[in-house]
Amino acid sequence: MTRLTLALDAMGGDFGPCVTVPAALQALASNPALNLLLVGDPAAITPLLAKVDSDLLSRLEVVPAESVIASDARPSQAIRASRGTSMRIALELIKDGRAQACVSAGNTGALMGLAKLLIKPLEGIERPALVSVLPHQQHGKTVVLDLGANVECDSTMLVQFAVMGSVMAEEVLELTNPRVALLNIGEEESKGLSTIREAAAQLKETPSINYIGYLEGNDLLTGKTDVMVCDGFVGNVTLKTVEGVVRMFLSLLKSPASGPEQKQKRSWWLKWLGRLLQKRLSKRFGHLNPDQYNGACLLGLRGTVIKSHGAANQRAFAVAIEQAMQTVRRQLPERIAARLEAVLPKSD
């Protein structure tokens, strides 16, 4: 099996090394061909490795970093002051050829800006997009982009996102001729902003894209499309809403449906039935847990960069690491570049 080396921004996110280091060890234990470069403050990382098996330690290296980019820092300021930070060093490891991908739970805007600066976009791509794969009710998955990298998008960018999303659906989900839709406020052709209508017209004229038209937000998890395209503002709000609803739903399955007084009045068999239903429903809908699809790929770069949710726990960050491995092994940047060369005009 081909060995992979990934760089992890160990200091990024809400919890830093307390989450990233255990997640890294979990990924190493599950993947014997994986090597990891943990970028961050050795004083914060090393104590968490004290009782780790020697085999795992042999595939792990701590790369020192002087500082960390704050999650609330303005991207422009963070980029100017980024030298010596864990995020920048992790990205530089890709640029220098020491790592094949980077995973960070840090500041999204800073990660986007530094990735464009250091890794560079693919030929024909104006701006990379954050993309994730979400489960739907038909027991399949849908590629969704942009999830927050670009708040404002013109029609050309939306078409580029559609091309990249289509390639990802083919390579990661192994779909043939994946369906592509634009997220809009209605399915009628006259609905939506001018940029969306212009993108729709261009997609209709792109033979390599199986464009099926507009879909609304309530269609996101129905399985009506394999790729859903939108600007970063709409995508981020949509993703956070879906995650919030799913977490609420799963928490309701695990908690009593009635108050303390009603709970005391229930007979033993009703209590038993309630626990049984909670267990079965939790198992039935557990695949919707946002932790299981954490990690958005910054698609459109010459290398692989994965953005983990800032509030990710150990399990979720480990999923982001797995996604980075899958993206590298599928050679996604190279395959997107080949498709772009065939269907999009080169930028001047």
Swiss-Prot record:
Transmembrane segments: none annotated. GO terms for biological process: fatty acid biosynthetic process; phospholipid biosynthetic process. One of its GO terms (molecular function) is phosphate:acyl-[acyl carrier protein] acyltransferase activity. It is an enzyme of class 2 (transferase). It comes from the Bacteria. InterPro entries: FA_synthesis (IPR003664), Phospholipid_synth_PlsX-like (IPR012281). Keywords: Cytoplasm, Lipid biosynthesis, Lipid metabolism, Phospholipid biosynthesis, Phospholipid metabolism, Transferase. It holds the Pfam family FA_synthesis. Catalyzes the reversible formation of acyl-phosphate (acyl-PO(4)) from acyl-[acyl-carrier-protein] (acyl-ACP). This enzyme utilizes acyl-ACP as fatty acyl donor, but not acyl-CoA. This is Phosphate acyltransferase. It comes from Pectobacterium atrosepticum (strain SCRI 1043 / ATCC BAA-672). The lineage of its organism: Bacteria, Pseudomonadati, Pseudomonadota, Gammaproteobacteria, Enterobacterales.
